[in-house]
Design a protein with these regions (language model features):
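Conserved alpha-helix/loop element of class I SAM-dependent methyltransferases that forms part
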Residues: 44-61
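N-terminal, positively charged/glycine-rich alpha-helical extensions of SAM-dependent methyltransferases
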Residues: 1-34
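A short SAM/SAH-binding and catalytic strip from SAM-dependent methyltransferases
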Residues: 125-138
């Protein structure tokens, strides 16, 4: 049986919230340009900005793309509509259902982790849009080398950990210094390195408001109901899951998940690398 990881559940819940509150199927951050007010009504526009930003950085001559960690398949659909040949890697069974419903047989969908991918195909571009943080660096780069065409490209758009003290309320991301040093040892040439932390960090302010105004009050109401009606079960539940509950409070309910905090601990970058012959 497939073991469900917490991050997988989080992405599926995130998609449900995105559809209901923001009328979007994208799962990535928004790209908040100057003049675009940071408010829920503009989330979809910011995410479209992000999607277009990615497309603008596709190198000339690219026709085939592997979308690693394709989320709901929304951006894969956008690439297909733009004329690219696109295949997808989708390790989450729940999200894969959304991908299949969206793009059908227009793409081959590999239902596995990227590191475990087995295929005879090769691609002009490997795209990791907010999926690189979940990959095992060394194994992922070995896989990338093996399935990229000669002089093919790797496009990464994701956040990384800064070398600062303290603990970020937003987990995830490779350490930026380790990543950059490791890539210097790989048969790749860096073409682009763009810091878009300022443009993406406002997405955390949107997330914070949703948590504080909707999710946290709902959590408190449910907790009040359970402790009032099922006190013994509630005490047992609170004891068994005390570490997870404390983690949820620290990460989500403390109010620290803000754009300012994100920008302090993380750096959001777009990297374009070309494979050497």
């Amino acid at each position: 049986m497939h073991k469900v990881e917490l991050k997988e559940v989080g992405l599926d819940i995130g998609l449900a919230f995105a559809k209901h509150f923001y009328k979007t199927d994208y799962l990535h951050y928004g790209y908040w340009t100057k003049g675009l007010t940071v408010e829920p009504a503009n989330v979809f526009e910011a995410q479209e900005n992000y999607a277009n930003f990615l497309l603008e950085h596709f190198p000339k001559g690219v026709t085939s793309v592997l979308d690693v960690g394709c989320g709901s398949g929304k951006f894969a659909e956008k690439m297909l509509d733009a004329g690219f040949k696109v295949d997808c890697v989708s390790p989450s069974p729940n999200l894969t259902k959304h991908v299949k419903a969206r793009i059908g047989n227009r793409s081959e969908i590999f239902e596995c982790r990227y590191e475990d991918l087995s295929t005879n195909k090769s691609y002009d571009l490997i795209l990791c849009s907010e999926s690189f943080q979940y990959l095992l660096l060394e194994k992922a780069m070995d896989k990338t080398q093996s399935i990229l065409n000669d002089k093919g490209h790797l496009l990464i758009c994701d956040f990384f950990q800064r070398n600062v003290s303290g603990k970020s309320p937003v987990s995830g991301g490779h350490k930026i210094e380790r990543f950059l040093n490791y890539m210097k040892t790989q048969p790749f040439t860096q073409i682009i390195d763009k810091d878009i932390t300022r443009e993406t960090s406002p997405s955390l302010d949107i997330m914070r408001d949703l948590i504080q105004e909707v999710i946290f009050p709902t959590w408190n109401i449910m907790a009040y109901y359970m402790t009032s009606n099922y006190p013994r079960f509630s005490r047992l539940f609170s004891f068994v899951f005390r570490k997870k509950i404390a983690q949820a409070h620290r990460k989500y309910f403390s109010g620290g998940t803000s754009g300012e905090q994100f920008a302090h601990f993380k750096t959001y970058r777009l990297f374009l690398y070309q494979k050497n012959n």
